Amino acid sequence: VLAHVTAQMKAVEQGAPCDLIFQSIAGSQKGNEAFGFTARTLEEAKALMLQKGTAEGPNVLYFETGQGSELSSNAHFDTDQVTMEARCYGFARHFAPFLVNTVVGFIGPEYLYDARQVTRAGLEDHFMGKLTGVSMGCDCCYTNHMKADQNDIENLAGLLTLAGCNYFMGIPHGDDIMLN
């Protein structure tokens, strides 16, 4: 369920079966607070899942990231998007998540202007995920008002495949459900 971490925690506390708790994360404390949580919240979520969750292993969290989220909440402290995104992966790694994926291009041309920037960001995110050792995947997407099309997104998916991307969260196949 792609709900806020606290809503998922309440469901687990009430007996709902759950293998993974999801949360979008940012690369700064201020960014995460803008998303409505703190590191302590994630620690509590992990402890709850290890006690009451249905997963068999110790990796019970799923995080989504994406370049630009700190800029949209004015939580970047004049730091570039790539550095802030790298901080996301270091933060994620602390919690030993089962999955981490970037949703590259979702936030729009205000932060990634066109297909070239989306491609660059997707490859940067993949590289940083590999460097930090998180189980890194990608959701390749774009917004309708961005200078990109499905061919660009499929090209990115192909490049990420060649680069050894662990998984894709949704495969474009000439159509993006988020655009319909």
What are these regions (language model features)?
Residues L2-N180:
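Anaerobic metallocofactor- and corrinoid-dependent redox/one-carbon enzyme cores
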